[in-house]
Each structure stands twice: as C-alpha cells, then as structure tokens.
Amino acid sequence: MNDKNEESIDFGYQKVARNQKKNLVADVFQSVAAKYDVMNDLMSFGIHRLWKRYTIDCSGVRRGMKVLDIAGGTGDLTAQFSRRVGAEGEVVLADINDAMLKVGRDKLRDRGIIGNVRYVQADAEELPFDDNTFDVITIAFGLRNVTDKDKALRSMLRVLKPGGRVLILEFSKPVSATLNQVYDFYSFNILPKMGQVVANDSDSYQYLAESIRMHPDQETLKSMMEAAGYEKVDYQNMTGGVVALHRGYKF
C-alpha cells in the first residue's frame, strides 16, 4: 500500500510529494513575511481591508467570546476581534509559520494590543486545542495553502463550540468571463513583477497566483464544508467572485 505522504499534491501548478508541501509553503511565507502587509495593500489596491472588515461584520463576535484566527499572519483580523471581545474574551492568533507569527505579534504589541490576545504556532490540520473551545473561527487567505483541506475543515469543526460559526475568506473564481480574463492577466503578468520590485521575490507571488487558480471554487468549497460536518453553509461573492466568504455552523 502506498504511503499517503508519498502521494503527489498541488503546489501551485507543480506536483510535489504531500510531505513536501508544508515546507515549500513555509519557505514562501518566510520570504514574504516582512513585506506581507505592504504587498497586500499594493496587490489588492487596499480592497483586502474591506473584505476583512466585511468578514468581521459577519462574524457575530461580541464581548466575552473566544475567537480563533487561523493563518492569522500579521494580525489584521485579530486586532479587530480583540476590540470586540474585550477584556472578558480572548483571541488566539494561530499560524503555522513562525516568521508570520512574529510579524503579527510585534505589530499588535506596537499598537498596544496585548491583554486578550494569545499567539500559537499551529497547523490547521491538527489544531492543538480541546474540543468545543471557540465561539468563532476564521481563516483568511490561508486555506488554499493547507495541504489537506478536508482534514483542516474537520479539525476546525472539532474545536468549534456547538452553536459556533466558521468563516473562510479566500480567493475564488470570478463569476464573469471578462473579469476572469483581466484577473488572469493581472495575476500572472503584474503580481510577480510587483513582488520582485517590492519584496525582491517574484517566485512567491507566482506561486500565489497559481495557488489561487488551484483552490476549489465556491460551490466545491461549500460541498467540502458540508461533507466535513458543517451545517447551514453559504457563501457570498465579493468583487465579482475574486474573493468569497464562506460560512458554516456547528449545531
């Protein structure tokens, strides 16, 4: 019988051994961590802030809740959740990459956000938390980098409290053929050059474009969430489907 770790899996448009992908993704984010926020603003023309704000507005997070921000990176969502949960609540910023986690921790501490935020280096596929721990779980622009997405969805469901919700904000498939063509041109011709100029790294942004294309589309991800055990799963397209916000509940 073949070892599952020896099976091939997508890394952008490349096929790599399953047990190699995490290290390859780690290399990407080690490289881009220092310029991650700057590149996000440039790549999305600042629109990523609106996508994240909408996600926060849809989260239902309120005072006293416990929130898990997976692939929380530089802490954009965590910072807002920290204000919402107050001193009685807690936000756990989790990221598999230590460089991204350090950038996020330093940024939030510089802003004086220290009392109710905890930082954990964690793999979304094997979350190191007890069952039924969190009221809300978010993962923004991180699921496409996970090796075993189905396993990660199940892991998130396990640590979600009954009555809790998960929100997945991720690049998706534009609904218009014209927009899709423009998006392809921008992604494959502009992004890598921008990455080279700003972050001295075109390869990581080539991977970014490829990983977006290989990520499940809106309906496929919805079906994956339902298969993992989430209920009342829905999604909303933003910016013509360039990004989609999926929501699911645990009852």
Swiss-Prot record:
It catalyses: a 2-demethylmenaquinol + S-adenosyl-L-methionine = a menaquinol + S-adenosyl-L-homocysteine + H(+); a 2-methoxy-6-(all-trans-polyprenyl)benzene-1,4-diol + S-adenosyl-L-methionine = a 5-methoxy-2-methyl-3-(all-trans-polyprenyl)benzene-1,4-diol + S-adenosyl-L-homocysteine + H(+). Its EC number is 2.1.1.163, 2.1.1.201. It is an enzyme of class 2 (transferase). GO terms for molecular function: 2-methoxy-6-polyprenyl-1,4-benzoquinol methyltransferase activity; demethylmenaquinone methyltransferase activity. S-adenosyl-L-methionine binds at T74, D95, D123, A124. Keywords: Menaquinone biosynthesis, Methyltransferase, S-adenosyl-L-methionine, Transferase, Ubiquinone biosynthesis. One of its GO terms (biological process) is aerobic respiration. Disulfide bonds: none annotated. SUPFAM superfamilies: S-adenosyl-L-methionine-dependent methyltransferases. It comes from the Bacteria. Pfam families: Ubie_methyltran (PF01209). The keyword Methyltransferase applies. Pathway: Quinol/quinone metabolism; menaquinone biosynthesis; menaquinol from 1,4-dihydroxy-2-naphthoate: step 2/2; Cofactor biosynthesis; ubiquinone biosynthesis. Belongs to the class I-like SAM-binding methyltransferase superfamily. MenG/UbiE family. Methyltransferase required for the conversion of demethylmenaquinol (DMKH2) to menaquinol (MKH2) and the conversion of 2-polyprenyl-6-methoxy-1,4-benzoquinol (DDMQH2) to 2-polyprenyl-3-methyl-6-methoxy-1,4-benzoquinol (DMQH2). PANTHER family: 2-METHOXY-6-POLYPRENYL-1,4-BENZOQUINOL METHYLASE, MITOCHONDRIAL, METHYLTRANSFERASE. This is Ubiquinone/menaquinone biosynthesis C-methyltransferase UbiE. It comes from Idiomarina loihiensis (strain ATCC BAA-735 / DSM 15497 / L2-TR). The gene is ubiE.
